[in-house]
């Protein structure tokens, strides 16, 4: 993997090339809690975390494609608006507030299932070298990759900076020009 530094620069350049980000908007500095990629001691594990996240996003993308295909099949696509959005910027929540580093233990939360529907114990937390992505795991990609996801903005969910509050809002439907871009602000309170 090229790591988060190279990928942030590449993503910023791509966003500018696509016209999604004005060329005058500079890439924000790397988050102060995120080391330079070459100083990351657990590169292989960090790469695995991003691979799992990428697979999840690919699954989301395929699921949206499936919805569109069904709407086409039922001849309802021309009568449907599809909204895709998030309620905040990327989440830095790995082990909340660096729980593992501070306390030496993983997440301890009521929202994390204790077992899979099949009864297998769920491994919670983002322990270094613990595999995530399987049905019996509950993990995330943490602040280091959230910093990449929020390119070009600073900070992330829980912050009032653009990285915390700017989020994608994609709409598909009748009378909406394909590949069009609007700069109209949209606000939703969750």
Region annotations inferred by a language model:
Residues 17-38, 118-135:
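Extended, charge-rich helix/loop segments that form flexible
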Residues 26-28, 59-96, 127-131:
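Metal-dependent active-site segment of extracytoplasmic phospho-/sulfohydrolases and closely related
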Residues 58-61, 68-71, 85, 99-102, ...:
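Aromatic-residue-lined binding/catalytic grooves and analogous aromatic/hydrophobic interfacial grooves
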């Amino acid at each position: 993997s090229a790591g988060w530094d190279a990928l942030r620069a590449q993503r910023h350049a791509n966003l500018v090339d696509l016209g999604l980000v004005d060329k005058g908007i500079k890439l924000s500095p790397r988050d102060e809690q995120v080391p330079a990629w070459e100083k990351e001691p657990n590169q292989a594990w960090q790469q695995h975390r991003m691979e799992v996240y990428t697979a999840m996003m690919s699954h989301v993308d395929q699921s949206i494609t499936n919805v569109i295909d069904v709407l086409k099949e039922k001849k309802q696509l021309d009568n449907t608006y599809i909204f895709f959005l998030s309620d905040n910027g990327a989440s830095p929540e790995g082990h909340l507030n660096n729980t593992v580093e501070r306390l030496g233990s993983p997440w301890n939360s009521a929202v994390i299932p204790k077992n899979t529907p099949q009864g297998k114990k769920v491994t919670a937390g983002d322990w270094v070298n613990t595999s995530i992505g399987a049905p019996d795991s509950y993990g995330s990609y943490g602040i280091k990759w959230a910093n990449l996801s929020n390119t070009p903005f600073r900070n992330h969910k829980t912050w009032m900076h653009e990285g915390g509050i700017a989020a994608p809002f994609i709409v598909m439907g009748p009378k909406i020009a394909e590949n069009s871009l609007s700069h109209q602000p949209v606000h939703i309170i969750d």
